């Protein structure tokens, strides 16, 4: 395998979503992680009783951790959470004590990659959203 091919295989795209039924309330995350070949890993995970922003950060953290386990070099993340996207890009400061440790951990992991994060409308994040809602309904973990 050529080095260029190996580098292409280490490029991942993630769609992430966190959801809470009530805020705080029963919460779950959904992550769709896709490699450069188009293969997808879908993660649906119950995270207990949280608020929506904690759930959104938990979804991003799961994507970062999974991408690093897969030896990703590049990770492009798409999220419908303006708070998470704007805090991760530095447009907003993270002043919330309940979000700060998640934000800090995500920033630290993101520095290990060529990382970018983009805001998308909710209707363009439906697969991750369905996985998050499934986790809340079933209170389970699935990869």
Give the predicted meaning of each segment.
Residues 1-3, 44-47, 85-88:
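A generic short-segment signal for beta-strand/edge and adjacent turn/coil regions
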Residues 1-6, 100:
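N-terminal intrinsically disordered, compositionally biased regulatory/targeting segments
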Residues 5-54, 65-69, 73:
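RNase H-like nuclease fold core
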Residues 7, 33-41, 58, 79-83, ...:
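Short amphipathic alpha-helical segments, especially helix-boundary/capping motifs
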Residues 19-23, 61-141:
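RNase H catalytic domain
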Residues 49-56, 95-99:
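Active-site beta-loop-alpha junctions of metal-dependent nucleic acid enzymes
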């Amino acid at each position: 395998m050529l080095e260029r091919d190996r580098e292409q295989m280490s490029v991942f795209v993630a769609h992430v979503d966190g959801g809470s039924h009530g805020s705080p309330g029963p919460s779950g995350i959904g992550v769709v992680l896709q490699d450069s070949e188009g293969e997808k890993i879908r993660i649906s995970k119950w995270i207990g009783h949280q608020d929506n922003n904690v759930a959104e950060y938990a979804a991003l953290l799961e994507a970062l951790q999974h991408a690093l386990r897969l030896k990703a070099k590049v990770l492009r993340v798409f999220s419908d959470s303006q708070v998470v996207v704007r805090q991760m890009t530095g447009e907003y400061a993270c002043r919330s004590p309940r979000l700060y440790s998640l934000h800090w951990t995500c920033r630290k992991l993101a520095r290990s990659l060529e990382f970018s994060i983009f805001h998308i409308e909710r209707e363009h994040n439906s697969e991750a959203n369905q996985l998050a809602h499934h986790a809340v309904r079933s209170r389970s973990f699935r990869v």
